[in-house]
């Protein structure tokens, strides 16, 4: 069984913000799969259990704020007895150019507080992550930038990237070969 978690902040005020790119990716995946999330306050997540290419998959969004994302990830992992190496976290990255992705099997939190909390709560950094570039914040406070909404032009760049992310997720689940996914999808994509 796999666990795919998109990071973001709950609440209408955060819809379409840069920090919520993980939620945006999950919404697109759910639309593709024609399924919806259900809220489970005990697990601190909105999630669904579905099948992709015959594999059981949990797709989730934490109900907590970004900085406490580890609570939901840990609870889902323990409840469904999911191995840490079968977890994929989708998140924003200000160090990547807008619309570029980076897929890794392990690594640091890179200053991303949601990822930092997951690493702390799981007690390991050895889980998969898919970072989506939201660009730099050179002329803005970082917090204001990540909590700011995408412009129309930025959305036009991001939406094809989300399709690319879905392709990577589906291929990972169908092949169970993450090394090939990293090789194929980490190369610069033309959108």
UniProtKB/Swiss-Prot annotation:
TRNA binds at residues 14, 65, 67, 113. It comes from the Bacteria. Its EC number is 3.1.1.29. The gene is pth. It is found in: Cytoplasm. One of its GO terms (molecular function) is tRNA binding. It comes from Acholeplasma laidlawii (strain PG-8A). This is Peptidyl-tRNA hydrolase. NCBIfam families: pth. One of its GO terms (cellular component) is cytoplasm. Monomer.
């Amino acid at each position: 069984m796999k666990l795919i978690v998109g990071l973001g902040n709950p609440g209408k005020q955060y819809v379409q913000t840069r920090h919520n790119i993980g939620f945006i990716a999950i919404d697109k995946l759910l639309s593709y799969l024609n399924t919806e999330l259900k809220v489970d306050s005990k697990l601190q997540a909105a999630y669904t259990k579905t099948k992709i290419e015959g594999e059981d998959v949990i797709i989730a969004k934490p109900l907590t704020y970004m900085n406490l994302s580890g609570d939901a990830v840990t609870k889902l992992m323990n409840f469904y007895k999911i191995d840490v190496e079968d977890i994929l976290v989708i998140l924003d990255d200000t160090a990547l150019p807008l619309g570029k992705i980076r897929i890794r099997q392990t690594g640091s939190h890179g200053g991303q507080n949601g990822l930092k909390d997951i690493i702390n709560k799981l007690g390991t950094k050895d889980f998969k992550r898919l970072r989506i570039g939201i660009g730099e914040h050179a002329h803005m406070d970082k917090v204001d930038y990540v909590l700011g909404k995408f412009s129309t032009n930025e959305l036009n760049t991001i939406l094809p990237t989300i399709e690319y992310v879905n392709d990577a997720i589906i291929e990972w689940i169908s092949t169970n070969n993450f090394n090939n996914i990293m090789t194929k999808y980490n190369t610069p994509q033309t959108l």
